Amino acid sequence: MNSPVYQTVIVGGGFAGLFTALHLAHEHYPRSVILIDKDERFCFKPLLYEYFDGEMDHFQVVPRFSELLKGSGVIFVQDTVESIDLHQREVKLTSGNSYNYSNLVLALGSVTGYHQVEGANVNAFPFWTQADAIALERHLRDCLQKAIKAEDSEQRRQLLTVVVVGGGASGVEMAATLADFLPHWYSALGGNSSEIRVVLLNHGKEILDADINNPLREIAERELKKRAVPIEIIVEAEATAILANSIQYKHKDKIETLATHTTVWTAGTSTHPLIKDLPIPKEHRDRHDRPLVTPTLQLLDFPEVFVGGDCAAVQDNSLPPTAQVAYQQGANIAHNLKAIALGKELKPVKVNIRGTLLKLGINHAAANLFNVFEVSGETAHLIRQGTYLTLLPTAIHDFKATTEWVDEEIFHHHLDPHDVGKKVVQAVEIVGAGVVGLLAARKLLKMLGDEDKGE
């Protein structure tokens, strides 16, 4: 008779998976932990725009899992999961290896969803990973180089036109980023920056509609017009086909064509194929095919399995697919896994939405604090960047205390609703006083990044 296997396997190294592993290590979890991800590096997706436009370096935004997990006792396996057998409690990898588990954590996130739009998966650029960011940057630089040499005005117009599909947070952040740095790049080549054209195509009547960032919509619309080149927003436009040199979309019952060599796709996500393949009945899934989980984030039919992040649907508790949600879920999953190991009672997961952060161009952002106070411009940019930097637990972040003022004072305190106004005033004062500290921290990051480039 085989001895029972007492180990926890975590599939997926996004926010939920990574922070589950790190919190297990921090809490001295008594069982072995294995983290499996197909990539060598963790991708800090909220800051991928900063990596893309050169504001931040790879060691900050896409650090290696081996560095993040060093000294934690967590075993990292870089491999692709081929299948998950919930009945046999086994995870099979494409390498031929397999792992049995006593507990499983599914944190696979979601994948880019093209919604059956013709040519989108071939001709559009997704923006989800480090590889996506590198591919898009190379393509755009190539387009600008060709535009400088192009004698035909129509060809040059196509090369200098970029269309972003999707008016949610990702689309808004992408459009704002492009509209700031593309003119800079083109001017450096000797081109006329006013020829750059950035178009944001949105299916709904308003950008950020039904999005957690909707309270920031008016600020976003205002800031999009203030970029180095104003962003054109086309609403009630449904993409119907993405071609190599154009995009077709339906607008007011007419099919329109926009000539462009670059279409960036940010128009939604789909459930991960491995999650779709799990033996979970339809009645235990939501309308997006994600598995329903209990308040403790366990599968209804397989309580030894926890699911967190974008690939989970918590019963009677709709949560936005954001980093702060996945981060908090990871901590709670770790707590409950330790409770199981020690024979203690599990606790329902509580997630506090502490605010929303939206990048609106280089050194500009908007922040909605506790849904009662809004900040925009460079102040919001510092809040956003400082908050995210404090989440990344690497050895080089020993200066964390320098930026802790943002994280602790603005986002991590539980506020009494009666004290919100007072606290917000304090928060603004703290932001002003802490700007120098954060700038010093950013300078340190830059110095460390320059050293790291030699690897």
Residue ranges and their predicted role:
Residues 28, 329-439, 443-448:
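C-terminal, flexible cofactor-proximal segment of oxidoreductases
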Residues 48-56, 121-125, 215, 279-282, ...:
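Short glycine-enriched, charge-decorated loop/helix-capping segments at active-site entrances
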